Each structure stands twice: as structure tokens, then as C-alpha cells.
Amino acid sequence: MTSKRIIPCLDVKDGRVVKGVNFLNLVDKGDPVELAARYEEEGADEIVFLDITATIEGRKTMMNVVKDTASVISIPLTVGGGIRSLDDVSKILGNGADKVSINTAAVENKDLVSISSAEFGSQAIVVAIDVKRIGNDYYVFTRSGKYNTGINAISWAKEVEKLGAGEILLTSIDRDGTREGYDIEITELISKSVNIPIIASGGAGKIDDFLGILKVADAALAAGVFHDGVIRIMDLKKYLGKNGVEVRM
């Protein structure tokens, strides 16, 4: 049985970690390098670093911050934000990241997923899917959750698997920062539709939320509850272990 992963997320803007609600109203939460080191010490399995304004500002990912963050941790680091080309993927991996997360560019240029996967291996390619519920369906949003692509989330998940993604980072925009719990429904629907691991994101508020989501996802990503000290990673892992979830201690 594969261990379930607990992954803190560093949403980075102007070199600082920030957190908002529904992708808006961002508040400063600290230095990414310090937080990454702290989370590894506390028992995190991986770190996800997202340069959240690179795409909408039309610029490249902050390489110096990526390099500094990668240099202080030994657990896997996934980096996303502003990735538009194979050269971008190569530079991020070359600066110490283990995986890249491609979101908007995957929708706008599907070849980027397949070419990157062929070049660096599917294990290095994560496709991030930001979803919002509209009526009874879930749709894919890009450009930091601002643009509705009109693409059905389940169809897109199946497609990115075929394109060569090794993993999906699935974020519920509706739940992001609300601390009302993960969107188990869409996570389960997508998990059943593909054979690659799903990292669930958006809505973690209490320790119990992780127990629920890890029944349908391979990993749980969270930000605010870790940044604010609401949940400590080792306490969370002990709780999960006691409740029959396989975790790495």
C-alpha cells in the first residue's frame, strides 16, 4: 500500500508566501525558504511552490527563490507558475525542483505536456487543474482562477493523463481558503476517471478533513492551516495513522 502524502503549499507573490480565500484577498504569511525548511522538519512529504502571479503578469517564475528553496530541503519540490515552454520546464528542474506543475499553459498548448513528459519523464510533470462548480458540472479555470475555459474537468483530467502527466494537482476554487473541507465529490469523480495520482487541494480546515479526502486522493495539499499553526503536520500524521491511513512518519 502506497503511503498517503501530506504536502504544504507555498503560494508565492513578490518573493513572499501569501494566502487568500477563493484565490483573492492575499495576506502575507512569511518567507518561502524558511517555511519550506520548517515544513520538512515537521514531517512534510513534499513541498509545492506556486508563483501565483507569474502567468497573469506575463513573466517567468522567480528562479532565485526556487533555487534557494530547493537548496534547504531534501524532500521533493514541485514548482508551478508562469511555465510556458520546454525551456521553462528545463530551467526549473535545473534549479533544483523535482517536478513542475503546468496549469494555464497545458490548456493553451497541450503539446507542452507531452513534449515535457517525453523529455523529462512523466514523474516530473504535474498538471494543475483549478475547478469551479457551475450547476451540476465542474469546469476548468485558468489564469489564477480568473478565466473559465468551458472545459469539463473530468474530460480534461482524462486528456492530461493521455498527454503524459504523471500526476494531477486538483484545486477547488470554491473551497480555496474557506477551511470548509475539501471538495470530496469532484476529487472522487476524477480519481475514478484516471490511473495517475491525485493531489487534492482547497478547503482544509480541520484534521478530520484530511481523513475524508485521503479516502479518495493520493495526497492532500494545504496552505493556510499549516501557515497559521492550526494543524501541525506531525500531529496530523499521527491522527491519520491511528485512523488506518498509511503515512510516512
UniProtKB/Swiss-Prot annotation:
The active site is at D11, D130. The keyword Cell membrane does not apply. Heterodimer of HisH and HisF. One of its GO terms (cellular component) is cytoplasm. One of its GO terms (biological process) is L-histidine biosynthetic process. Its EC number is 4.3.2.10. CDD domains: HisF. GO terms for molecular function: imidazoleglycerol-phosphate synthase activity; lyase activity. This is Imidazole glycerol phosphate synthase subunit HisF. Keywords: Amino-acid biosynthesis, Cytoplasm, Histidine biosynthesis, Lyase. Belongs to the HisA/HisF family. It is found in: Cytoplasm.
